[in-house]
Amino acid sequence: MILQTKHFGEIEINQEEIIRFPDGIPGFDDYTQYIFIENPDKEVPFHWLQAVEDGALAFVITNPFLFKPDYDFEISKNVVEKLSIEDQSDLQVYTIVRVPENIKEMTANLRAPLVINTKNKKGKQLMLDSEVYHTKHYILEEIQKMQEQSNQTSPAAEGGRD
């Protein structure tokens, strides 16, 4: 199947690669089929979730654990059943990223992660009831915190040998 997209031009997609969001993504309820487009630059942790029904609709997504390793939330039994999750290893978590002109203001929506069963290609955007996670987590700030924590726990920071 050929899909004409705004951001990637004409791409060929395999029906088996289509990820189905039965409930859509909030705000985009009419779009239930997406393709994961991996960034060809392996050094860059941002990818795309391209709508199949609308070539102009694509979300920038990333793995939240890359910048927020302690990210933690529960997946309800209802969602486990709806996505037919049999094993946690079949689950992939992403967050939608907002990329403004000033890259320092780039944010990730940690309050509403995307969970995808990679085995059967079913997905859902969760809405977490959390005071800890927000819709706009500044990614570069989170990375900076990780680096500071890493520097504090390194042997050199603890007075270890070089």
Swiss-Prot record:
Reported function: Acts as an anti-CsrA protein, binds CsrA and prevents it from repressing translation of its target genes, one of which is flagellin. Binds to flagellin and participates in the assembly of the flagellum.
Alphabetized SUPFAM superfamilies for the sequence: BH3618-like
Organism classification: Bacteria, Bacillati, Bacillota, Clostridia, Peptostreptococcales
InterPro entries reported in the protein's UniProt record: Flagellar_assembly_factor_FliW (IPR003775), Flagellar_assmbl_FliW_dom_sf (IPR024046)
Keyword terms: Bacterial flagellum biogenesis, Chaperone, Cytoplasm, Translation regulation
Protein name as it appears in the record: Flagellar assembly factor FliW
NCBIfam families membership: PRK13285.1-1, PRK13285.2-1
Keyword Transferase: no
Assembly notes: Interacts with translational regulator CsrA and flagellin(s).
One record GO biological process: regulation of translation
Subcellular location: Cytoplasm
Cellular compartments per GO CC: cytoplasm
HAMAP family for this protein: FliW
Chief localisation class: cytoplasm
Source organism, top-level taxon: Bacteria
Transmembrane segments: none
This protein's encoding gene: fliW
Assigned protein family: Belongs to the FliW family.
